[in-house]
Amino acid sequence: MGTVIGLDVRDGRLPDEAFEAAIGWLTDVDLRFSPFRPGSEISRLARGEVASEDCSPDVRFVLTRCEALRGETDGFFDIRGPGLRGGLDPSGYVKGWAVEEAAHILEAAGARNYVLNAGGDVVLRGAPEEGRPWIVGIRHPLESDQVAARLAFEPGPGRMAVATSGLYERAGHIVNPRNNEVPAELLSMTVVGPSLALADAYATAAFAMGREGLPWLASRPGYAGYAIDRELRPSWNADLESYLAAAASSTGPARQD
């Protein structure tokens, strides 16, 4: 996926086979889905060399989910278009989905307290140690070595996810369908929720929506957003307040989104 993978597991040593399986899965996804690889299924599909019904089950699943998300977001999440590499690029969903599936592999091997970070797409569960939350830092959109805000995640029954879309990521491929232009109102949009696949896609859509992104996210049960506009002014949903407040009272280091 052209990104760096970071993993912190606090459950003791997991079997080497679990790590190998997770990395193997992510490598396989990159080989099949990357629009930058001429021989990938996605590239061949974009060129019309294969039909969607002849693609692998995973590719067909992703195409179906992306089409559903296009409808859910009123076209603000769209994997097809002239501004996308080859006219077809599902990366805005695939990355989060692939990392989430890798987390399933680790959990099947016994991981219950971990953070998995793939180039800023973060999925986490449990806690680093008893009485402390995981801390995730939202990257400053203009200063890559700075953190714009910190979010704290207390231990819960399931996993949580953080995904960001912004100018430093792939905004040149994010287009407002109303005017076919790159969004001009925001520098970044971060989404928090239980599914990394959806958080990734929602961040892309909400970034494209500009100032309407946060109100739209408020209508997505379980999801909340943190936006930074062109004047570096932050704004966020009410549901995100608890994560910000918890981080303000914690002294732990932040893992950058």
Task: Name each region found by the language model.
Residues 1-257:
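Mature catalytic core of soluble alpha/beta enzymes
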